[in-house]
Amino acid sequence: ARPVAQLNSLRFGDPKLDRTKWHVKGVVKGIGDYGNSFGVPVLAGEVFFDKTYNTNPLINAMSVGLVKKDRIISAVAKGVGNPVYIVGSSTGKDGIHGATFASANLTENSSEDLPSVQVGDPFMEKLLLEATLELNKSAAVIGMQDMGAAGIICSTSEMSEKGEHGMKIDLGKVPLRQKNMDPFEILLSESQERMLVVVEKGHEKEVERIFDKWDLNREIIGEVIEEDKLYFYVDDELVADVPASSLVLGGGAPVYDREYTKPAYIDEYKKFSIDDVPEPSNYLEVVMELINSPNIASKRWVVEQYDTMV
C-alpha cells in the first residue's frame, strides 16, 4: 500500500524525571527524523504521562495506506521451486532479541537487558517502498513480507505456514553488514528495511530489473519446497530445521497461561464517587491546576517536530 498518514500514541513516565525527559526527547526526535525523511505526514497522535511508565515507555505507531483491493499481496509462500529473495538493507546484529524483550516480564532492572537498537534508514525504506509498489503492478510476486520482529526466522515461518509449504534457505547468501555473525544471529536479526519476497519461477529477471532500478540489494537465498518444514543452511551445512507451523501462533507454537492477580488499586478506584469531591471555592485556581497538568497542557512542542503535510 502507498502510505498516506502516520499516527502515534506515546506513553511516558513522570515528566520530572531525567530518564523520562531523555525518553521523550529521543522518541519524538526519532519519529520526526524518520517520518519526515520518509515523506509520510503525521496526522494525529497523543502523549500521556504516568509513573507506570517510568522504566519502560510504551510507543504505539500506526500507518495508513491506500491499495487497490485486487492488488493486495499476501505474506504467503507457495509454488514448489519458486525462488525466495531477500531485498533491501544488509543484515547486522542490530535488534537481536528485540521481540523477546518486547514479550518479557518487565521489572525495574529491565533497562539493563535492553537489546541492541535497530538502525533505521528512512531513505533506504523509501527506495524499498517504491520498488515494492512497482512490483505490485506485475504478476511475478507470489508473496511478500517485511522483516521486523525476529527477522528471517519469523518471515520464513509465517509465509510458509500460511502457504502450507516450506523453504530451504541458505544463510550464507544473506548480505551482511557485519563480519563473524553466527547463524542464529542472521536468523534473528531485526535489521530494518528488508523484505522477503517469493517470486514465480521464470520471472527472476523481471523483478531483478525493478530492484536494480531502485538500487536495492537483492539476493536469492532459497526456494519454496513441498514439505511443511524450514531448512536453514550455511553454504552446504544444515544448521537448523523446524516445522514452520511450530513457530506460528495458531499452529504448533506453545501458548502460556500466565498467573495473574487482580490489582488492589482497581477496588480503590471503584470506591471513587464524584459526589465526594467538594465544590471548589476558586474555579480559576482549579482551571490553572488542570491546564498545568502535562496530560492536558498543549503538546504543540511535539507536534511541530513532525511534518503534517508532504
Residue ranges of predicted features:
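Glycine/proline-enriched, intrinsically flexible loops and inter-domain linkers
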Residues: 1-310
